[in-house]
Amino acid sequence: MRATWEEKREPASLARWDPTPLEIVRGMLELAKVDSQDIVYDLGCGDARILFMAVKEFDAQKAVGYEIRQDLCEDSRKEIQHQSLQKRISVIKGNFLDADICEASVITLYLFPTANEILRPKLEKETRFGTRVISHDYPIETWQIAETEVCSGGTLYLYITPQAFQSSSSNDTKNDE
């Protein structure tokens, strides 16, 4: 029996907190070529480790995370305050399906395949031209992968919008013209 939209929107069915190893975080940010011009969003940010590394090691202009769990939000916010990074890092308590992602230049994901499937239309509608989307371990079905990196902790998939969601047959047609 297929789950309804509302059942799929339940956070527990979309992801569980499984902290991404720091070497994978670094790999994700390197693959996305994050730099001082970037605004990085992490959907389901957990303890905000991607946000901290984006700002501290890659000098991202800003990093924003969405997290549904109150305890993780509180812990992350305390650490942001402790490190005096409130002007560059923010964690929003809420469902990432309701997130305003239009300012993101990089979006990181470590979500179940079902979550990627549910999130795909939102990404297609709301991301700006050239946004880099990085998914850890689970590809976004039907999207064209710009680059894949296999590392000891899993596989990273890089997509660049809007090219990622153009079908290969439409690309073939454009090349023939």
Predicted regions and their residues:
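Conserved SAM-binding motif I beta-strand of class I
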Residues: 62-67
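Conserved SAM-binding loop of SAM-dependent methyltransferases across substrates and taxa
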Residues: 49-60
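C-terminal substrate-binding/active-site "lid" region of AdoMet-derived donor-dependent transferases
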Residues: 114-177
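Conserved class I S-adenosyl-L-methionine
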Residues: 37-46
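A short SAM/SAH-binding and catalytic strip from SAM-dependent methyltransferases
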Residues: 102-118
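S-adenosyl-L-methionine
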Residues: 1-38, 74-103
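Conserved short alpha-helix immediately C-terminal to the canonical SAM/SAH-binding motif I
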Residues: 69-72
